[in-house]
């Protein structure tokens, strides 16, 4: 069984780009460890091809080499926050909500057409950070779009923004999961890894 992690810096998380079996220091590492421990006899290959800074259009552009050619059994995708990020700051790229939806739909359509992979969608999220509060209305517009796409295309949907919103009040301080509100720290990465494991387990049990 081949599991492919796709996305941006949250998935990349400092991985070794010379070796796609290197999970980096983010949630793929924690998810892979949990899966290996739970299914020690299963033949499962983990590939991480997240690339820091990627937007939805950039993920689409590299689909053949980084998704289709690999023919994974499961593709998980966490993408979208950079489409919002790049609307702000000096070097703006004004990607509209409609363009993000079209990009994401094109990615999912191509996966369906050219692979037999199960699809797992992880929603983008924002955590407690004053500088990123201006992004919240834009993310709140995008999340229902991604949820609708997940209902149409995905086998598993992980609404991370909602999950974090419920979990954060139980933690000792607002930046428990992330210092900058976008990139998870070790606590945040381990938390996503556990959510990922719980969500993907039924797909694994049906295949191994």
Where are these regions (language model features)?
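Alpha-helical cap/lid subdomain in secreted, periplasmic
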Residues: 30-45, 58-208
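Serine-esterase "nucleophile elbow" of acetyl-processing enzymes
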Residues: 1-52, 63-71
